[in-house]
Amino acid sequence: MVKIAIDAMGGDFGPKPIIDGCIQALKQKLFIPILVGKKSEILPLLPKRYRDKISIVEADDVVSMHDAATDALKRSESSIYKAIELVKNGEAQGVVSAGHSGATMTLATLRLGRLKGVLRPALVALMPTKSSRRSVILDVGANVDSKAEHLMQFAVMGGCYAEDMFKITTPSIGLLANGEEKSKGNELTKATFKLLEGYKGFKGNVEGSDIFNASCDVIVCDGFVGNLVLKASEGVASTITGLIKEYIRKSPVAITGALLMRKVFVLLKKQMDYAEIGGAPLIGIQGCVIVSHGKSNPKAIKNAIFQAISYVDTGVNGHIIQRLETLKNREN
């Protein structure tokens, strides 16, 4: 049974939504949860009937959002450090944390190490599309500066992820640029294009709109661009949702119409809600680490745990190692 270490202290709202999410996950799937944090704060929030099903690892320190990411390396008593160490020591297969994302990625990369052949790990986001399937975009923040060789590997890792997690036989892969033509892009994307030409599934350059129109399964970019895309998308979704609510409240007719369209709004929310995904996997490292939003509610934590379980069960890491090894042999 898969063991998942959960950083109980990492979220913006304390341990309660994280513990509640863990309990929700236990009700639906078989796994072994390990809550890492201050036992004095966790136990009062943990119903007695779950105390024999959830173990607690004491951690009396918390890396806050105001701390530098590299400070986490010196904080061996912090909840995220101890959660990562559980994976390193083989006591857990995956980590879920809604805490300091920079600290989580730094610890995961330096304490767990990269997979064989991986130059840089990448953070993956699953974006909503007009179809029922989400698009995979990476990197969305693990690397601000990247080389063409890194983006080439992101394409390989993203393809493996899409194959294993979404059962896509040959995922289509696009390189995010300012136009579809081969001549478009900056020096980085042009150099990456040359490396990806001929790679199975590569369809060329794609534009920002292609992230959401389901024309491409995997979109590759550097972490600076990817993070801007992610944050801008969150902002647009939040603004549109707010405007719809505001305009509906202003008109009795609109309120009636909204009631009639309630089912449509529920389906739309399900497709757009980050809590449905749970978090962003950091791929290319030993083990499994899911980086969740600081504002994660119990539903988001539950789905982050589910994502970690699926990641471990499908063997994504082994697939990545094998694919990179095959590419290396072809180059030689």
Curated annotation (Swiss-Prot):
Disulfide bonds: none annotated. It catalyses: a fatty acyl-[ACP] + phosphate = an acyl phosphate + holo-[ACP]. Gene3D superfamilies: Isopropylmalate Dehydrogenase (3.40.718.10). GO terms for cellular component: cytoplasm. Pathway: Lipid metabolism; phospholipid metabolism. It comes from the Bacteria. Catalyzes the reversible formation of acyl-phosphate (acyl-PO(4)) from acyl-[acyl-carrier-protein] (acyl-ACP). This enzyme utilizes acyl-ACP as fatty acyl donor, but not acyl-CoA. Homodimer. Probably interacts with PlsY. This is Phosphate acyltransferase. The lineage of its organism: Bacteria, Pseudomonadati, Campylobacterota, Epsilonproteobacteria, Campylobacterales. The gene is plsX.
